[in-house]
């Protein structure tokens, strides 16, 4: 499968080269009086992009979508069996692949074309509106969604926005709460190493110093990342949470929500999973968040941050104390 996935990057290369060459040419011809937002160090796309450049960007991102999802070449779907959680392959269903209703055997993301459309739309909104901050995904599998986000930001010359790729890179943790979902930890197909994910970024020419891999179960890694973001005064313009479990969603929201500025977005991949939905509902209620929820692809949702709130981190610290954790895995 690794060889097949490596070859997929070639599909995107010609379009990428054309887009880059045209962009370089246009910058050389661009007059000095074009509006540039100096504080963001990026061109305002609505003012600076030519129609040809927009068309090339559109082709590049569409090509990425059908490649990263395995849609273009009808990649078979992984079907999870029962008992020993065996892996079975079945023919691709076009509708399921579009909305992220299956797991591609050859591909880089399971969120479907609609899920990637959502990332593109929200990133374009924050770019257009001048909302500062990075893209962060917590729970990345093979890295495809984060790769696509990086590609979108690159295509708009967003050179100052980081991409944070957060995962254990060894699958989901066993649940420590009796009402949480524990079977995820038994699914070996969810365990993809950091080296493999990093390699995927490299194959698509998306790996640079602005991409950061944060490894570890969220309860151990995200409190440390929280400290790092505070020290660096980083913001998160788009936060994508894909934790599947009650505990994981609480880890993500309590450690990272405070960094999303007004106008930024929270994407919840697992709105269709009851325990994950419960965590999000409790977090929103606890912090009196009334922002409108926008469902999409049947199982996910997002909302836009409308006001800054102090996160009740002391509650989270007490919650962590109730969990059976491995002190040796503590990172900070």
Language-model region placement:
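Conserved alpha-helix/loop element of class I SAM-dependent methyltransferases that forms part
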Residues: 118-129
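Intrinsically disordered, low-complexity regions enriched in polar/acidic and amide residues
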Residues: 3, 43-46, 330
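N-terminal auxiliary segments of SAM/dcSAM-dependent transferases
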Residues: 41-77
